[in-house]
């Protein structure tokens, strides 16, 4: 299968999503298909959780690309429902937008929810030693 690219942030076109977009009504008609980049789960003693753990939802964007309107609404809906189910953030830690400047992750600069972070803060974010506010408040 040959990968196709059409997005401004140079993400591959997912064939099944494109097929759905061709066959189903458009966003103007009330049907939206989005893909979420990452669900990250921490569990066990190393992170202070039981075997079920806790998780975050994340979307990655290249450069200064932002969530589109449909993504804002879709991911915001998911976030709101998950927050209702876990208002104290015991299991659901929130939604995060990760912006990066280079696909060489050792050279890239990063922003988490539009805030620039150092490379060390970015690495600490993944191990839960650096905590920042979720995207949706």
Across the structure, where does each feature detected by a protein language model lie?
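A structure-centric signal for secondary-structure junctions around beta-strands
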Residues: 30-35, 52-54, 92
């Amino acid at each position: 299968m040959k990968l196709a690219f059409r997005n401004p942030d140079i993400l591959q076109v997912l064939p099944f999503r494109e097929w759905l977009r061709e066959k189903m009504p458009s966003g103007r008609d009330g049907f939206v298909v989005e893909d979420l980049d990452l669900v990250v789960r921490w569990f066990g003693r190393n992170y202070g959780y039981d075997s079920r753990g806790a998780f975050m939802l994340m979307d990655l964007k290249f450069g200064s690309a932002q969530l589109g309107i449909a993504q804002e609404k879709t991911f915001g809906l998911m976030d709101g429902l998950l927050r209702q189910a876990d208002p104290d953030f015991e299991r659901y830690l929130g939604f995060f937008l990760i912006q990066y400047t280079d696909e060489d992750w050792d050279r890239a600069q990063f922003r988490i929810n539009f805030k620039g972070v150092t490379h060390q803060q970015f690495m600490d974010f993944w191990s839960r030693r650096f905590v920042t506010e979720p995207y949706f408040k």
